[in-house]
């Protein structure tokens, strides 16, 4: 059996293992840094990049009154700063094909 993943990547039972890089919140919500991570993954030998896409409203709620006794952080604000929005996908694919 053979499976064509991209124009340049065909895999089969005899193929070497694929190297998959993951980009999550390590770009700190900066699109330019996100795109740079794609390039770094390629230069490091990754065959594919897995993008962990989320937006703050999808995984958290914006709690206004956190209990100060528990030293809680507002995860909504943290996710908002580090999100990988779906709107970045189109540019990411263009960038990856170009580079």
Model-flagged regions — what are they?
Residues 17, 72-75, 97:
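Structural/interface elements that position substrates and couple domains in central-metabolism enzymes
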Residues 22, 41:
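Conserved, mostly hydrophobic/aromatic
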Residues 1-20:
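N-terminal amphipathic alpha-helix/helix-capping segment at the start of soluble metabolic enzymes
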Residues 36-40, 91-94:
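Alpha-helical scaffolding segments of alpha/beta enzyme cores, especially the outer helices
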Residues 27-35, 77-90:
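Aromatic- and glycine-enriched glycan-recognition loops and surfaces
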Residues 44-84:
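Glycine-rich, proline-tolerant flexible connector loops at the mouths of alpha/beta enzymes
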Residues 42-43, 97:
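Non-catalytic positions within long, well-ordered alpha-helices that form the structural scaffold/packing
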Residues 87-99:
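A structural motif corresponding to the C-terminal end of an alpha-helix
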């Amino acid at each position: 059996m053979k499976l064509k993943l991209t124009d340049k990547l065909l895999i089969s039972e005899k193929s070497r293992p694929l190297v998959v890089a993951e980009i999550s919140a390590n770009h700190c919500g900066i699109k330019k840094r996100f795109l740079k991570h794609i390039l770094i993954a390629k230069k490091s030998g990754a065959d594919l990049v897995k993008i962990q896409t989320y937006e703050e409203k999808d995984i958290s709620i914006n709690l206004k009154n956190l209990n100060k006794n528990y030293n809680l952080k507002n995860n909504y604000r943290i996710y908002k700063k580090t999100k990988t929005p779906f709107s970045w996908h189109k540019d990411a694919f263009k960038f990856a094909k170009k580079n």
